[in-house]
């Protein structure tokens, strides 16, 4: 939602409720990280699931209010949108470094680059991804229940995309987020007040704590262990 990491050009939505919970508020900036003496920062990319957009009226309104965000975040595949988010983070860091701060930020892809970054007294940035749905490409673009016939092809695409994230330097991937995906069925992520204050129709309809990992999810976990 067009937050600026240098803290100089924040949009209206990011300034709301700075002292209370608001998922779009700006909580951190690169200057704050530098001032706080951080050595390593996890840069987590999260793309909202389509079911969440359908369930939450506020998000539907924001899609209409910010068409550029809709085009960038919700229209592409989860995989493409996640890569675009990481591209943008890297561009923001590069732009900030050009302003000649006292400490440079650098995205690192492996242990060797991390160690070099620390020796050089730079702040290491490491990519991470929240939600296994970010592995979904064109074949997996449809909702989980609609793509059963494509399962072998979807599984191959997911494993290929996982390897891409690894090569890009993603340090970890959470399997689940709010909704079931091709890897796993999650537990409900919110306390009771969250159920009352929001419409979780699609989540509650498909919520089953006994399902756990799918066969594809087990292969993804094994692949991550091997990596």
Across the structure, where does each feature detected by a protein language model lie?
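Short, intrinsically disordered, charge-balanced linker/junction segments flanking boundaries
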Residues: 223-227
């Amino acid at each position: 939602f067009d937050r600026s990491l240098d803290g100089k050009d924040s949009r209206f939505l990011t300034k709301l409720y700075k002292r209370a919970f608001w998922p779009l508020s700006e909580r951190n900036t690169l200057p704050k990280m530098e001032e706080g003496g951080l050595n390593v920062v996890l840069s987590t990319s999260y793309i909202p699931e389509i079911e969440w957009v359908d369930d939450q009226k506020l998000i539907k309104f924001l899609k209409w209010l910010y068409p550029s965000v809709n085009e960038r975040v919700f229209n592409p595949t989860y995989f493409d949108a996640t890569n675009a988010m990481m591209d943008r983070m890297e561009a923001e860091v590069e732009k900030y470094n050009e302003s000649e701060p006292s400490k440079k930020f650098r995205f690192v892809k492996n242990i060797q680059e991390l160690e070099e970054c620390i020796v050089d007294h730079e702040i290491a940035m490491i990519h991470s991804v929240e939600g296994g749905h970010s592995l979904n490409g064109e074949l997996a673009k449809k909702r989980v229940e609609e793509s059963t016939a494509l399962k072998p092809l979807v599984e191959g695409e997911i494993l290929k995309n996982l390897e891409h994230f690894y090569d890009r330097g993603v340090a970890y991937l959470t399997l689940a987020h709010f909704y079931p995906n091709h890897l796993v069925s999650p537990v409900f992520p919110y306390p009771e007040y969250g159920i009352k204050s929001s419409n979780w129709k699609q989540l509650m309809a498909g919520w089953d704590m006994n399902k756990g990992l799918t066969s594809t999810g087990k292969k993804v976990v094994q692949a991550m262990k091997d990596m």
